[in-house]
């Protein structure tokens, strides 16, 4: 008993040491990603201007022109600088309205606003009021989310927070710049997704068999989703310009970008989260079954995994459908309001692209579930010792 106690105590200590080491490595990776330049810092607009936060003190709406629900013209506001070089000073700010409901805003006294200040030394030339200042609220929301994860899931929650910010940094610092520089979106999209998947799963599981099982299961589904997106995009004649704001890239000096390939890569990236989620669910379920019943046969372990997979797939495919439908709700309302036949709706290129997103992701889930169950049942029943995890 003393020998076994010492043995498992050593195993626990080794596991804690590995988790601590992996946590340190994660922090280093996050730090490196934060410091990596994207290569597009020189393209920043208003480099000769100061960006700051201001408070609206008073508004003059006499120059606004109302045309139905649309407003154009300019709003002149008295403002007070809350940050930046001119903090504490008061000045006049201009809010230009172009008649776009999605872009225009009407400020009121007391609003906190993001402003761009053009100046010549200590002399202010002009102040453009850009948008409501939302950074503080977004930061509070992110911190509340991170705190909830840590309180609820403790160590795993902390690692989940790391994985969340790691994903953001990989997308913003690596994937997006590579796409803008013209690298193959399909190849580098897969590499980026594989890297993120491995790092996220390693943060959740550490380095053990569960990592191998969930990674292999996830990548099988992601690869299948990517393959299906390539085939369907070509078969349905979908151009990448269906992506929101993508066409503007072509008019901004990036006319050599292959938007269709970027669309194919976006399907892979979009499906990776749900695929990874399903793979983790099945991996953890099979591991718990075998850990609590070490004598279970391989076939029964695989069957248990398949049962979990079937139940999870039923909701995960619906999750994808709801997620993509939610982004298209206004478009669907427009089609219905105009009396557009369902035949024409389904044949629309934007709707077809969302169908590819949904079906390719669902096929990825369908591929992930049985393969993960098969791999988990095979690997976890090879040894009787399941205390390592």
Where are these regions (language model features)?
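Extended, hydrophilic extramembrane loops/domains of integral membrane proteins
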Residues: 99-137
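Helical hairpin unit composed of two closely spaced alpha helices linked by a short loop
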Residues: 272-282, 286-332, 339
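Structural detector for short beta-strands of small beta-barrel domains
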Residues: 47-73, 113
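Hydrophobic alpha-helical transmembrane segments of membrane transport and translocation systems
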Residues: 311-314, 323-325, 329-389
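Juxtamembrane helix-loop transition segments at the membrane interface in multi-pass membrane proteins
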Residues: 207-216, 236-247, 281-293, 342, ...
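Pore-lining and gate-forming transmembrane alpha-helices of multi-pass membrane transport proteins
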Residues: 217-222, 252-269, 315, 319, ...
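Hydrophobic secretory-pathway targeting helix
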Residues: 1-50
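Transmembrane alpha-helical segments that form the functional core of multipass membrane systems
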Residues: 143-147, 155-250, 257-270, 274
